[in-house]
Regions:
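Phosphate/pyrophosphate-binding active-site segments
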Residues: 3-4, 139, 175, 202, ...
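Structural signature of the thiamine diphosphate
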Residues: 23-24, 66-77, 82-103, 126-179, ...
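Glycine-rich, anion-gripping cofactor-binding loops and their flanking helix/strand elements
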Residues: 66, 216-302, 400-431, 444-448
Length: 449
């Protein structure tokens, strides 16, 4: 056969990014990644976005991923460049955002010697990434990048970190980038166990007070349309988590509100009184459950989730189903029937009438007025938030529909997220209006952007 011309690891990395369909990366150069920056400079298919701080870079990549469905790609240097990613990796890990982050590393013979700008970034981030690895041999580079994109995108999405020693990257090797992935220990299940699903749907039909709980998994799987159809057919009311907001349009007559400590009275009462809680794509985080033994005390619980580890971790469930939310909901749509929920819906309407979401305004104009005006003005906006009071106003009052997306730090609650997230969302969606809503504190945390 013909002998392929060898290329450096830096060249292979750029080739790999193109093969993976990457058109934008968020990068901040430094000594250990300068050769990669040079390779990126020599081509024009991939745009490189330069922030002022690596934390802002990873938040921007995160929102880019959330709003486009692509993988967010980061490139930072070793040492402080890498450690500045930590909060952003944890944010993405909690909220299931696919990222591939490349960190520079000192040459192999210096690793472990406390060399200049050397940290064990794989060790530091082990608990906040889906996978992390140092490329110790040039011949492993292509395979590792291929696996990283596969791991980030599939199953429950998440951030992957690849640490690149400088000498490995300058070494010559094969120009080939693998076409397939063969990971023995990682086989994410997506298809639905039909026996379990039919059992769950039978329970749904029998229930007197059924309730859907939709989490961020419905939005991540982009199953909103199918889920809304299921809700329309069954006539079963819906509550959502903050990350699940928009699983059905927030102006839908069967949408009660968010549950949890920052949720609506009626939504929390519905969870307490329902006899079947049919939950899709949620982790049952402490913000929504309160005391675990008092959560949905009268209900049988169905839990559909892509992540085996999320099922029965916090709440004991009666019917566990490990599946991709979009596949599960599409199958449900084929089999569901209308449920008799008239009395149950009247009870919920009564709670809503007695305890609506209200807000005292001191002076002439309050946060709610601003958000409601925004609802009227913008049809297709992406709304990003920081974390705190203003975030709760947005998650309670902002209209989220098929055309309006909410981008917020849910699991970790990262102040400083909203502004760089808006930049990342706009880069991914140049034709859409992007609105960042921030508090005075969060705004100052990444104000350098």
């Amino acid at each position: 056969g013909k002998i392929l011309r060898q290329i450096t690891g830096n060249k292979l990395l750029v080739r790999a990014l193109k093969e993976e369909g990457v058109d934008t990366i968020f990068g901040y150069p430094g000594a250990c990644t300068i050769d990669i920056s040079d390779e990126l400079y020599r081509q024009d298919e991939i745009k490189v976005i330069l922030p002022r701080h690596e934390q802002a870079l990873v938040h921007a990549a995160d929102a880019y991923a959330r709003t486009t469905g692509k993988v967010g790609v980061c490139l930072v240097t070793s040492g402080p460049g890498a450690t500045n990613l930590v909060t952003g990796l944890a944010t993405a890990n909690y909220d299931s955002v696919p990222l591939v982050c490349f960190t520079g590393q000192v040459a192999r013979h210096l690793i472990g010697n406390d060399a200049f700008q050397e940290v064990d970034i794989v060790g530091i981030t082990r608990s906040i990434t889906k996978y992390g690895v140092t490329v110790s041999k040039r011949e492993d580079l292509g395979r590792i990048i291929k696996e990283a994109f596969y791991i980030a995108r599939t199953g429950r999405p998440g951030p992957v970190l690849i640490d690149l020693p400088k000498d490995v990257m300058s070494e010559l090797g094969s120009p080939e980038y693998p076409e397939t992935v063969n990971l023995r220990g990682y086989k994410p299940n997506t298809s639905v166990h039909m026996g379990q699903l039919k059992r769950a749907l039978k329970m749904l039909n029998k229930a007197k007070k059924p309730l859907f709980l939709a989490g961020g998994g419905v939005n991540i799987a982009r199953a909103n349309k199918e889920f809304t159809e299921v809700v329309n057919i069954t006539n079963v009311p819906v509550v959502t988590t903050i990350m699940g907001r928009g699983a059905v349009p927030t102006d839908h007559p069967l949408f009660i509100g968010n549950l949890g400590m920052h949720g609506a009275y009626a939504a929390n009462m519905a969870v307490s009184e329902c006899d079947l809680l049919f939950s899709i794509g949620t982790r049952f985080n402490d913000r929504i459950t309160g005391k675990l033994h008092e959560f949905a005390p009268n209900a049988q619980i169905v839990h559909i989730d892509i992540d085996t580890a999320s099922i029965s971790r916090n709440i004991h469930v009666h019917v566990p189903i490990v599946a991709d939310a979009k596949e599960a909901v599409a199958k449900m749509r084929e089999y569901v029937e209308p449920c008799e929920t008239k009395e149950w819906l009247e009870r919920i309407a009564q709670w809503n009438a007695e305890h609506p979401l209200t807000m005292k305004v001191h002076g002439s104009i309050g946060p709610r007025d601003i958000i409601e005006e925004m609802n009227r003005q913008f049809d297709d906006a992406i709304i990003t938030t920081d974390v705190g009071q203003h975030q709760m106003f947005v998650t309670q009052y902002a209209e989220i529909t098929e055309k309006k997306q909410l981008v917020t730090s849910g699991g970790l609650g990262t102040m400083g997220y909203g502004f760089p997230a808006a930049i990342g969302a706009k880069i991914g969606n140049p034709d859409r209006t992007v609105i960042a809503i921030s508090g005075d504190g969060g705004m100052q945390m990444n104000i350098q952007e």
